[in-house]
Amino acid sequence: MKEYKDLLKLVLDNGIMQENRTDTDAIAYFGTQSRYDLTKGFPLLTTKKMAYKAIFHELLWFLKGETNIKYLVDNNVKIWNEWPYENYKKSPYFKNESIDEFILKIKEDDSFAKQFGELGPVYGRQWRNFNGVDQITNLIEEIKKNKYSRRLIVSVWNPSEIKNMLLPPCHCLFQFFVNSKNELSCQLYQRSADLFLGVPFNIASYSLLTYMIAQVTNTTAKEFVHTIGVAHIYNNHIDQVKEQLTREPLQLPTLVLNKNIKNIFDFKIEDIEIKDYNSHPAIKGKVAV
């Protein structure tokens, strides 16, 4: 996607290297916006191979309101593993297990998973129970009843619960908009964005959410607008980013949803299909915790 490559180049060329809460310095640039036309294909990155099933499982996990990694682990999704593992290492129960041994315990021992697989009141909790409010249900009902509302907003930044989260939400507020052609667009505000590892997931995830909400509200998916506060490229991802910039984007794939689904909470992984996905080879990078 040209829009994503433009974002990488903007930050690489204009950002400033600085320290952050992790042990890895990053090139940071404040204030970006990218727009992805959802009528021209599903915006799944093609300049490196994406594990898109992991993206879909994570979104379904959010929609379930879950905050424990057990569901993700059971479905071989590894993107959240590091945070509960680092938290477990601080506990008196830690016996120098590797992260692989920790994840195996999560998978095989339900009581262990319940105690040590929890992330705190992160995305799923805030989506479905923000101080008692089910924001996703409210959002969809409001689109159905008052689609031109300018209050079609979900907030994940809950100051009263931030301290209890292993990782405060990076993508923290999103808003929907229906135009006079009955086309649905979504804008995400992301306070902090790991451009190499995180952002390709975020683009695909919120685009998928837009398509799903469009289906259950009888609208048509139009555009995903991605607004970022601190866009950053970690020091140990610079070579990977430069490699991506040498690669030409390929044709975008097509998203196919099960048209029989009328309630967003009824979607399962088998109801989401990607067709004609071709990409350049995968590029690995280490997550900063």
Swiss-Prot record:
Active-site residues, Swiss-Prot/TrEMBL: C170
Signal sequence range: none
Keyword tags: Cytoplasm, Methyltransferase, Nucleotide biosynthesis, Transferase
CDD domains the record matches: TS_Pyrimidine_HMase
Pathway: Pyrimidine metabolism; dTTP biosynthesis
Class of enzymatic activity (EC top level): transferase
Binding site for (6R)-5,10-methylene-5,6,7,8-tetrahydrofolate: D194, A288
Positions contributing to dUMP binding: R21, R150, R151, R191, S192, A193, D194, N202, H232, I233, Y234
GO molecular function terms listed in the Swiss-Prot or TrEMBL record: thymidylate synthase activity
InterPro entries cross-referenced by the UniProt entry: Thymidate_synth/dCMP_Mease, Thymidate_synth/dCMP_Mease_dom, Thymidate_synth/dCMP_Mease_sf, Thymidylate_synthase, Thymidylate_synthase_AS
Swiss-Prot/TrEMBL catalytic activity: dUMP + (6R)-5,10-methylene-5,6,7,8-tetrahydrofolate = 7,8-dihydrofolate + dTMP
One cellular component term from this protein's GO annotations in UniProt: cytosol
Pfam families recorded: Thymidylat_synt (PF00303)
GO biological process, one term: dTMP biosynthetic process
Compartments it resides in: Cytoplasm
Function in brief: Catalyzes the reductive methylation of 2'-deoxyuridine-5'-monophosphate (dUMP) to 2'-deoxythymidine-5'-monophosphate (dTMP) while utilizing 5,10-methylenetetrahydrofolate (mTHF) as the methyl donor and reductant in the reaction, yielding dihydrofolate (DHF) as a by-product. This enzymatic reaction provides an intracellular de novo source of dTMP, an essential precursor for DNA biosynthesis.
Quaternary structure (record): Homodimer.
Record-stated family: Belongs to the thymidylate synthase family. Bacterial-type ThyA subfamily.
Name under which the protein is recorded: Thymidylate synthase
